[in-house]
Amino acid sequence: MNRLAVEIPGLSLKNPIMPASGCFGFGQEYSKYYDLNELGAIMAKAVTPEPRLGNPTPRVAETASGMLNAIGLQNPGLEHVLAHELPFLEQFETPIIANVAGATEDDYVQVCARIGESKAVKAIELNISCPNVKHGGIAFGTDPEVAHRLTKAVKNVASVPVYVKLSPNVADIVSIAQAIEAAGADGLTMINTLLGMRIDLKTRKPIIANGTGGLSGPAIKPVAIRMIHQVRAVSNIPIIGMGGVQTVDDVLEFLIAGADAVAVGTMNFTDPFICPKLISELPKRMDALGISSLQDLKKERTNQ
């Protein structure tokens, strides 16, 4: 038995570690440095129906314990991704999780109906942190009813399991998670970035041209752990955890809190080899902590 194996809807993972969406592109650059078959899965860059240039620059800023970004979902659009990006990933055995974004419900439905055409795509990650342009720009993921409706609409057309990415910028993460689960979501990914800002002391203006950006990195890990623990306390829905993972101890902390697998984001920019390193280190750390397998760790968590 593979002691690192994880089975969740649509995904047979050889290990629980994967790069997070937006921090790995579509894998081509990283494939020059290591075998992508080492990874548990790959969360690909967000896809929208039409190409997007993203936000004006500067759109990235370092912080004391992480970074801010306001990339604006820059991507080449659905047709290009289906024709050029996903075919490259089909050579690997590693399952691909396609991140889908949009400005309207129709955008999401359009992409989700077709993204499964690639045999590499085994699941969808629904990015509901996007502003809903038909409802005053408020993010889809901040209202339980809107999140429920969008999830249901996507589930009606998707040919692969749907994991919904939760925004931490809400008053009650549990009510959002429960609404999404009730709509038929196969799993959750959490958390997305926290809204933040930095000021340039010389210009007296925000460093990010957009004003605000998403805070990621080690600074948000305690928030991610807390939110995963809260959702796990009321639901058995599969969870892919993310938010500030740097070390193998972070991976285990996420798993103990309630995640079934873990995605690594910002650290890919600091160390492109972070994912294979964590995969290599995980069994040794499990031995030191008396963890025989991830399956047993999950049973231990369930019985508490």
Swiss-Prot record:
Broad class of where this protein is predominantly found: cytoplasm
Subcellular location(s) per record: Cytoplasm
Top enzyme category: oxidoreductase
Role, per record: Catalyzes the conversion of dihydroorotate to orotate with NAD(+) as electron acceptor.
Residues forming the catalytic site: 130
Flavoprotein recorded as keyword: yes
This protein's name: Dihydroorotate dehydrogenase B (NAD(+)), catalytic subunit
GO molecular function: dihydroorotate dehydrogenase (NAD+) activity; dihydroorotate dehydrogenase activity
Cofactor: how bound: Binds 1 FMN per subunit.
Cofactor(s) essential for the protein: FMN
Biological processes annotated in GO: 'de novo' pyrimidine nucleobase biosynthetic process; 'de novo' UMP biosynthetic process
Sequence similarity: Belongs to the dihydroorotate dehydrogenase family. Type 1 subfamily.
